[in-house]
């Protein structure tokens, strides 16, 4: 309803305002009527008549909206994504494009021979609009003879106008086709006269004209389809629209048959249009159009022999991908009408629409499945994961309708194998080679080192955890990358390992990832993760005895387990039950029960578990009564109660004497006490006191962040100084900010409100002198997506930035602009002496006051503001006098720390005065726990100047070596810093070769124990052990260190032995034996950049493996798994640095031929027993595929033997479909390589070779399954995928398998009189034609080109 105009009169009984407010305001309270606009009226009427409905951003209110605000892919993969997107664009632009019909001769005009010699095209005549309309009406009337109106065609009818008039006037189809052909012919005749002497230009014009007409057909068809939704509420218009669409489809069909449309372009448009339809309302009509032109797209009715004349295979592959994608989208959609104006309440109707669309698409996919090559069902891995269940569901319909059940199941199995079992899948055996986790402690005279050995290691996960950028999308990462329980174990071990103790966020990050994984659709159940965690705890307890309990590990473990208990992921009751049932408590000689008791004492305990808790402690009273006497449940409750009295009174408490359970209980109580008490504003001193208590003494960071949220949301911040300290804390623990603060946007908005609306007025002087730019930069970097999505926050952040810039301009401006600040600080002072002496006196006086311990807080605060004003207003003078102050050395170390914490001094100023060495010595002095900004500044400075910092240490000195190692372990927390540290570590190892073992052993020992060994202990270890001994300490936490050491050690061995392969091989195999075939061995060579060393390592492993196969030696499964990973990693690493990634030495090639012959000589049963070795051999073969193919093309005797062996093994390997596919891939790639690679001189030998390869059967079911097994494709368990494909009839049979010779095309002359073929034609194959031009490798990948939708046109070489 639109409000009308009215006047307001003061109410009779309303009391007026007070006299003081009557001057400028109305006497009575009043409000203005709504000043509406035309647009608002339309919106109002629309909502009143139709209602308002807004779709939710997520499916359920309990689901986080983060996924809708942030990008789905992690930012670390953005570069890779861009590269692959560029590849796809290039492929679509250069390869998968319709290039016209000039090559096929279809671009030639269809009107070259129109009719007899007397035939003439109608002439063009200029008519008025009225007469043109009459002419069109006569043409559309079936009662008007055609010969009366065919003498001329009106001007203005061209292309789109002709087509539009045809469906608008409903011109009979025969007349419409005549009009189109005439207009086309007139246009062609006019244009072809320009290019009479240029056949090349004539062909271009023909192709261009045909494409122009095709584009106009497409344009009108698109327009008609999208007009559908405009006529929902008008039945008359809707009926007229149906008539127009029906007519135009018939017209398109006729022109399509008469080849007035470029078929390839039209087919491509149909596929693109079906793929881009997102609104399900439009989908039925595109599907109908697809069915109309199905035979043309799929070539089902083609009788052409020449493959190049048919549609490319990629078009059918694209069609398959589009249909499966649409099927997947519809299957997972809840509503079939995606429009705000519609709400489907009728579930049956919605399901009916959904089933109808699914049935239409299912029918088309089934046709493709039965009629097309299996290659059209090959997809990228990400797409296959989506399409696999859909394809199984679709083909299940064929089981009920078809008798060829076995054939269908075989096709589906072959497609599944082809998509899932690529060449570099993990080998080999289905049996587990090792336990998931093995913890080993190596004890030396100097100490012990615990090594963590995992059956599988995700190095990418370790890198992501180490980096842990504040803006990293862990939600997407956990959903996409974390898929196994061994990764869960790896996350927990990373969080509690001593080498990661500098990651203050480790425990909270691990808990967050476990929580995210549980909440994902394919996540693990809670009880499974809880079982894994407690199993890990039991394994850790076995490592240590009573005297040494790995304190660095256990402290982090206490914190992590308590965090998981808070989130409800684990329960202490479950732990106690497992502990009692294990029987560990009743073993008198068991030392790990003491670890369990200590762990239990440090866990937060519920009163319900009191009896079980006390029972566990009582079981060890005979060996150690201290646990029960000091830490029984009642005693812990009593301790907490005593501390509750002491803490508010400010009594001195030694918190380090109490277990973690006491600290957590006390911290929670104190937080409740603060929040429920009288609310007072927080000052810097009180905030610092609580920071020291929660973060350092109680080790409960999560409680301190809760307190921060409380005081921010309640606006309990006294002044700018307090706010500045709060920002320093948030910067110091910025990686916890994103994890502990629940609503980042609300928190930031409240923060800005406090600064701009409250503290800016309350404490204007401090606001003008204090810079918050570092904090705002952190917010902008970490929460850019949230800021972009929230317009209010974006505008607030812009205003904050402008104010920060304005502050700087005021203090750096003219005298009048900052003199006001000085007058506000010193209201009693009248002027400021601007001469040099005045500045000196002011600087020294305020500096002395600030550093004096006798001055009160207010005087120090004023002195700091004076110094800040001097620093900003006269920066050059301030830097000069601060340098003089430093050079006098009239200060204590604590004074420098105080100046740095107060932002009155920078580390660069100290470095410029005393050098970097002095700065590093200052860092080694432990500061007080409340120096938050100093700790943040120190860490940022080290990371920013990391290379210079590490280069400053001379590792020859034992003390300098320890400081160098300390910096590496504590600050190499990102990939960039690790790369810098790795380069400098290698450099120091090379410069101090005599102390290399000592340096690296000290590094590994400190990383594991956080303690340094003495120089005598290091010397003793270096004398008694070889460098290979160090590799026994390899695990996922120190892999990057061993990569640096391996680079140094292998290069040193390579040079000292004069490149002796035997000696280098002895060293390498000794390293492998020392690690006991650790899965990480494949990655320790990655830092080696010298391709000679890399080639040698690959050659040594290959030749050793080949010789052992020939000699018949048995292999350990761990060795085979490690072998193939080493060769794959090194080969791929070489491919990134040079183009020789696939080269193989001649010796290795000869051994490869011998191995093939060896496998060929084995019987079927022996060959089946060697499946694992054959699998590894074929993977190695594919690594050097191009190199091997080049050897084969030289046509040596060994090459012929190689091909014979490949074909023989391909025929015999029926026990493993994966291996059979691998042989097929190799042969198929060899066939492509030989076909298109030039340079063979002997044509006869080439013909013989190609004749053999041309007999390779096509990719179909009969090529991979023997005929005698057709009746039951699931008989052999090795060929089963574990798919639920339905039950097949035992008597069902498949189609007859064609013989090998039927795949070869033959040509002969057909005698019509005798009705038989006579005189077979001998055609010289195109691949036997000489080509003297050099070409590049066309198949330098391990997979067949058909996987990538690539296709080569069969044209003679130029």
From Swiss-Prot:
<dbReference type="Pfam" id="PF09497">
    <property type="entry name" value="Med12"/>
</dbReference>
<dbReference type="GO" id="GO:0003713">
    <property type="term" value="F:transcription coactivator activity"/>
</dbReference>
<keyword id="KW-0539">Nucleus</keyword>
<keyword id="KW-0805">Transcription regulation</keyword>
<dbReference type="GO" id="GO:0000122">
    <property type="term" value="P:negative regulation of transcription by RNA polymerase II"/>
</dbReference>
<comment type="subunit">
    <text>Component of the SRB8-11 complex, which itself associates with the Mediator complex.</text>
</comment>
<dbReference type="GO" id="GO:0000411">
    <property type="term" value="P:positive regulation of transcription by galactose"/>
</dbReference>
<keyword id="KW-0010">Activator</keyword>
<keyword id="KW-0678">Repressor</keyword>
<dbReference type="GO" id="GO:1990508">
    <property type="term" value="C:CKM complex"/>
</dbReference>
<protein>
    <recommendedName>
        <fullName>Mediator of RNA polymerase II transcription subunit 12</fullName>
    </recommendedName>
</protein>
<comment type="function">
    <text>Component of the SRB8-11 complex. The SRB8-11 complex is a regulatory module of the Mediator complex which is itself involved in regulation of basal and activated RNA polymerase II-dependent transcription. The SRB8-11 complex may be involved in the transcriptional repression of a subset of genes regulated by Mediator. It may inhibit the association of the Mediator complex with RNA polymerase II to form the holoenzyme complex.</text>
</comment>
<dbReference type="GO" id="GO:0016592">
    <property type="term" value="C:mediator complex"/>
</dbReference>
<dbReference type="InterPro" id="IPR019035">
    <property type="entry name" value="Mediator_Med12"/>
</dbReference>
<keyword id="KW-0804">Transcription</keyword>
<dbReference type="GO" id="GO:0045944">
    <property type="term" value="P:positive regulation of transcription by RNA polymerase II"/>
</dbReference>
<comment type="similarity">
    <text>Belongs to the Mediator complex subunit 12 family.</text>
</comment>
